[in-house]
């Protein structure tokens, strides 16, 4: 189900935002197409939207809808065929002792403290590192779908928190933050491998990773997980030769 007119909720409406500065490509303007009303977007409907290239931030369900750019490609890992690189095997073996526990979405001050440390070191100056519990709650905790908060602990110490959505055909990776001060750690890589393992446990074929942008260093890690499919012209196809895909502006 990758076409909007295939969605079961015919009462959904879509609007396009005004232009705003792109978070990933310098000197570019972005726009989003937003699905509304949010209370109609349950797990089944959201699963169809994800197949059509949408994702969510809190209760806000959107996809890129820019005027002169198609660089954002929705991507998903085909988990049963996932072939690990040597560095990914090292990450799995190094961190597999982490204890993962799944919860319904909830606020905890330990999670928030870890989130602030992560933002301060990984995304300093981006606005997300400001001390605002309300912003944190609004960004991560609202959901109308089957969402889980996953804690990863090492000898009782909180190392990572990941928000995931369980969909009819896969898991959607919503957001992850982790301890930025552990030397040599590769928590982010391990998290994706854990989510892929969880897909296999649930007999779900895909792990949705959001958007991949060829010219964004923030997004480069996603291309390391193969086989990777991208939604191109309404069809999911294998992402192979990366140089063949668009950078940004169309003529």
Swiss-Prot record:
- Protein name, please? Aspartate/glutamate leucyltransferase
Q: Which GO terms describe its molecular function?
A: arginyl-tRNA--protein transferase activity; leucyl-tRNA--protein transferase activity
Protein's cellular compartments: Cytoplasm
Q: Which organism is it from?
A: Nitrosospira multiformis (strain ATCC 25196 / NCIMB 11849 / C 71)
Q: Does the record bear NADP in its keywords?
A: no
Q: What is its EC number?
A: 2.3.2.29
Q: Which domain of life is it from?
A: Bacteria
InterPro entries referenced in this protein's UniProt entry, alphabetically? Acyl_CoA_acyltransferase (IPR016181), Asp_Glu_LeuTrfase (IPR017138), N-end_Aminoacyl_Trfase (IPR030700), N-end_Aminoacyl_Trfase_C (IPR007472), N-end_Aminoacyl_Trfase_N (IPR007471)
**Broad class of the protein's primary localization:** cytoplasm
The taxonomy runs:
Bacteria, Pseudomonadati, Pseudomonadota, Betaproteobacteria, Nitrosomonadales
HAMAP family in UniProt: Bpt (MF_00689)
Question: Record's family?
Answer: Belongs to the R-transferase family. Bpt subfamily.
Whichever gene encodes this chain, its name is bpt
Listed A to Z, the keywords are: Acyltransferase, Cytoplasm, Transferase
Q: Does the keyword Transferase apply?
A: yes
Q: Which GO terms describe its cellular component?
A: cytoplasm
Q: Which SUPFAM superfamilies match?
A: Acyl-CoA N-acyltransferases (Nat)
């Amino acid at each position: 189900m990758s076409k909007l007119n295939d969605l079961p909720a015919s009462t959904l409406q879509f609007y396009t935002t005004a232009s705003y500065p792109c978070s990933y490509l310098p000197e570019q303007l972005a726009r989003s197409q937003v699905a509304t009303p949010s209370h109609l977007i349950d797990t089944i409907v959201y699963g169809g939207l994800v197949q059509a290239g949408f994702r969510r931030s809190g209760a806000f369900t959107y996809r890129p809808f820019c005027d002169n750019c198609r660089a954002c490609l929705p991507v998903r890992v085909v988990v049963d065929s996932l072939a690990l690189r040597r560095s990914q095997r090292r990450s799995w073996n190094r961190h597999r002792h982490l204890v993962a526990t799944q919860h319904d979405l909830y606020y905890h001050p330990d999670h928030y403290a870890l989130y602030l440390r992560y933002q301060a070191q990984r995304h300093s100056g981006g606005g997300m590192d400001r001390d605002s519990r309300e912003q944190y709650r609004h960004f991560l905790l609202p959901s109308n779908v089957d969402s889980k908060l996953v804690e990863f602990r090492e000898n009782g110490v909180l190392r990572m928190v990941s928000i995931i959505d369980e969909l009819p055909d896969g898991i959607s990776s919503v957001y992850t933050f982790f301890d930025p001060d552990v030397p040599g750690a590769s928590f982010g890589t391990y998290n994706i491998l854990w989510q892929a393992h969880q897909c296999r446990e649930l007999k779900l074929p895909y792990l949705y990773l959001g958007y991949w942008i060829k010219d964004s260093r923030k997004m480069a890690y996603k291309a390391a997980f193969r086989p990777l499919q991208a939604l191109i012209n309404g069809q999911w196809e294998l992402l192979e030769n990366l140089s063949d895909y668009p950078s940004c502006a169309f003529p």
